[in-house]
Curated annotation (Swiss-Prot):
Species of origin: Agrobacterium fabrum (strain C58 / ATCC 33970) (Agrobacterium tumefaciens (strain C58))
PANTHER family in the cross-refs: MEMBRANE PROTEIN INSERTION EFFICIENCY FACTOR-RELATED (PTHR33383:SF1)
Pfam families, per database record: YidD (PF01809)
Physiological role: Could be involved in insertion of integral membrane proteins into the membrane.
GO terms under cellular component: plasma membrane
Protein name per Swiss-Prot or TrEMBL: Putative membrane protein insertion efficiency factor
Length: 119
């Protein structure tokens, strides 16, 4: 792009555009693979019929993919479900990233605590 010798702008741009989902590494457990596979199946099939109508950045399916990949099927699945619930009319909009780590109050037996309020 810039024409400088040794420039890697073009290589980075091609690599970043490969997938719209989170590209970070995650533990390939059966639950996580099932969850991200299910979301990817939705993205490749039904998402085209529904259209681009998500009010958030990243979209709800991208959020769900990243949440499950980072935090596992249980926690990430609840986070994705609550995100879809917030996406409808009267809900929130704007930038709503997946948290890097979950705080100590979010345990597996208290799924209602995964509901994060957009600030």
């Amino acid at each position: 792009m810039c024409g400088e010798p040794g420039c890697r702008h073009e290589q980075t741009a091609v690599k970043a555009g490969r997938s719209r989902n989170w590209a970070g590494s995650f533990a390939k457990t059966p639950g996580r693979l099932f969850g991200v596979g299910f979301i990817r199946l939705y993205q490749l099939t039904l998402s085209g019929f529904v259209g681009n109508s998500c009010r958030h950045i990243p979209t709800c399916s991208e959020y769900g993919y990243e949440a499950i990949a980072r935090h596992g099927l249980w926690a990430g699945g609840w986070m994705a479900l609550f995100r879809v619930a917030r996406c409808g009319p009267g809900g929130t909009s704007g930038l709503d990233p997946v948290p890097e780590e979950l705080d100590g109050s979010k345990r597996w037996w208290t799924p209602w605590r995964y509901w994060s309020r957009h600030r």
